[in-house]
Amino acid sequence: MSAGGQRPRRTFVCLSSQRWSDGMWTNKQHVMSRLARDHRVIYVDFGTRPMAEILRRKIGAPEGAPSPAGSSMGRRGWGARLDPLAPVVEERGGVTVLDFPIPRFAEYLPHGSRARAALEFDLRTFALGRWMKTEGLARPVVWVYHPGFGGGVRSLPSSRVVYDCVDEYTTFPEFRGATAWIAGRERELCAVADAVFCTSRPLFDAKAALAPGRVQLVPNVADAAHFERAADPALALPEDVAHLPRPIIGFVGAVSDYKVNLGWLAHLARQRPSWSVVLVGPHAVADPTTDLSQLRALPNVHLVGYRAYEVLPAYLKAFDAVVIPYRLGAATRGIFPLKFFESLASGRPVVISRLPALEAYYPDVLVADDVDSFVNACAAAVALEDDAAARERRVALARRNTWESRIAQMLARLDELDELSAPRSP
């Protein structure tokens, strides 16, 4: 922070674990879109593309004609189009999005293999460094979400390296058989990071030894104002749930077996056949082994699939209670679900499994330890739905935990680091 109290305008380069255009926004897009209001943000897309699509995007448009809409190849025109490592550059709402040409066949290589790491992470880091040099981009804050980038990020010209740790990647299904590799990469990243932010107490405890004195707990939050729209009398209910039998017990999020206890939901539907159980979200994300057959077989379970972020408040308005029935185990020990405060902001009663990261909020929700207590908690939640005072307490709690407050904490830490490293007057 400057002597006049003004925060310096920074440049952030975000090495993400998700595409900017992903319909299910998470920490990455929420944080970077808000940072872009006052700072320059460059967002490096994650993932791969088929070679044919890479070629189409790089050379399929005449000079000066972006392809797709809003994209370009940066400053070098046709030279960049012919450069195999040059990114497609797009401007998205004040954020510069870089999509480097990482070929799709990288995804068929085993996680943890030298070849896959070289293509998916090291090549992207190398290509980013070249682009930064070409663009004259010096000393930005490099903000990392995926630990797979490892210590290689220190090769980038940066003023600071931040690791925003939002998940325990060693438990992800995609890294089964490669947990030692991803853990090693995370150790490398923590060793070079100037600041490590963790979204839950279990994550903080796990990373504290990897970056002594540089780890800070900054829990997940929500866009409370967006989800408070669920209380708007003028907001129409979505047609696919508007006429379902009530009460409606709803879940919003990726329907993946490694996180969501599908057995609990099936048991609830069987025990309460007159109720409706609605699951809003894509299926089998990050876990292709997810089996939804037991849910599909139940007439009162409704798998509506992915819905855009903009319409989620309308679905929450339709629910009589919101559930977050995550499995209890290694994969969820460090999870602080974004949907927690989003659900509270809707005003609806919330039922959760006993997630360690949410322990401080147990008094504000209904907590289930097993399948039978889950059914009982849902019944209790339905009975609470008309309690106006309880509804306002839930909304007030969500309002105290916003993206703006989380970002302010993280920027304050960067300011502290600047002050500590600033030259002292004699």
What are the residue ranges of the model-derived segments?
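Acidic anion/phosphate-binding donor-loop and adjacent secondary structure
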Residues: 173-177, 222-240
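Nucleotide-activated donor-binding/catalytic signature segment of Leloir-type glycosyltransferases, i.e.
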Residues: 281, 289-313
